[in-house]
Structures are given as structure tokens and as C-alpha cells.
Amino acid sequence: MTDRPVLHLSLPVDDLHAARDFYERTLGCRIGREREDWFDAWFFGLQLTLQLRPQEVKDVSQQGVRHFGVVLPSLTEFDELVHRVAASGHAWISKPEIHSDAELNGKLGGKLADPSGNIIEIKFYADSADYLS
């Protein structure tokens, strides 16, 4: 058990096997507890529960602004994840790019969706102080 709070998020999926493959192989998440209709994935410090709820799954086009994500601590980790996504053949919704406008200066980020349409943003900031400012 950890002495620090752990954030938990639960999302619907329509195919547990495809979800597990995506989170484990493509994103590199460690898989935790598993049951017939759900499993936990350790998503960069977040306990992510993927539940078989096909009736609750929405297409990416219906997600609007809804997404979750991670700010990776190093450019190396960001690049490794980008390469794993490329090797998996999984497409990006918005390919990783450097944002250079004043508000997002130095942010490197992209978005992709899991096989059930849950949108995930992957980010890296050149200056770690920027992501909470």
C-alpha cells in the first residue's frame, strides 16, 4: 500500500481483450486485478479500471472535450511512448507536436483514443513548472 493518495478513474469499454492489449502493450501499463467484466491498469500512477459496458461506450466523435491524460516527466519517456504507439499501428487523433503559442510554450502533446473511443492526451513540458502554471 502507498502512503500517498492514488487517483482512480473508471471507464467503459466494449472489448476487454482489445482494451487490455492497448493499455498493456501500446501504453506500457501494468495490469492489476482482473475479473470477468473488468480489469485494473496502472496508468502512470492512476488506478484505471476498464469495465465491460458496451452500452455506455461513445464514439470518439461524441466525446466532445472529455479526455484524460498524463504529463510525462521526460522527453525520453514521451518519445518511447510515441514509438510504442507507432509500432502498434494505432493512429493518433492529433499527432504529437510542439505547441509554441504563449500559453502552451514548450508543451509537446498528442491525443489518441483507446479501442473503445476513450480519449487520452499524452504531454511533456520542457519546463515542468509550466504544466501547473
Task: Name each region found by the language model.
Residues 10-49, 53:
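Core segments of cupin and vicinal oxygen chelate
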Residues 30-36, 97-99, 124-129:
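Conserved catalytic-core motifs of GNAT/GCN5-like acyltransferases
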Residues 1-17, 47, 68-70, 124-133:
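N-terminal beta-strand motif that seeds the catalytic metal site of vicinal oxygen chelate
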Residues 56-60:
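Short, flexible, solvent-exposed loop/turn segments with mixed acidic/basic and small polar residues
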Residues 16-17, 69-116:
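Vicinal oxygen chelate
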Residues 2-5, 61-65, 104:
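Short glycine-enriched loop/turn motifs at secondary-structure junctions
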